[in-house]
Amino acid sequence: MRKNKNFGPDPNLNPYKAKQPTPPSSRSFIDFNTQRVCPSCGKAIKITYNFCKFCGVDLSSIEPIGNSDEISKQLAITAATDPDPGVRKEAIDTLGEFGEKKILGVLTYLLLNDPDENVRKEAADELGDLHHPYSMEVLAKALKDESPIVRKEAIEGLKKIKRKTKPEKLDKGKPKERVDHEE
């Protein structure tokens, strides 16, 4: 029995299966004038949000990079969009030297989304150097990265944050040498 193409759809094809749209590129552009990146989950949200709609993190204490000086904003755009991984890595390094909380989101985004392992490694290093507790979750996610150098740097970053946020032990030494704080 021959099929006539003039008589309706092919019965062997699923009529409900629409053509799949092309998947978005792994590196979508972040407009830092209208968006900010959550430092905990790495997702882009509106710049006006004080809480991440994806993970619920309070962002009110972290200034969006879009509201900051033009140099930081341009470095963030370069770090996220430049085609050369070496340039992106240097932009991340320079942003890290500023040592400000507002770059946490950019570093998180690059750690989770950049295709180059050296760029992701640099982002993990800078997140560890900032010692912010929000970075712990994203560094823990980076432990599953395909690259061993990124995983190693994520471990180092977690160690840096843990050392910085860990309360010092008051009672060190042998029992006789301890200071009695109840006097």
Residue ranges, per PLM feature:
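Long, contiguous interaction/recruitment modules in multidomain scaffold/adaptor proteins
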Residues: L13-D69
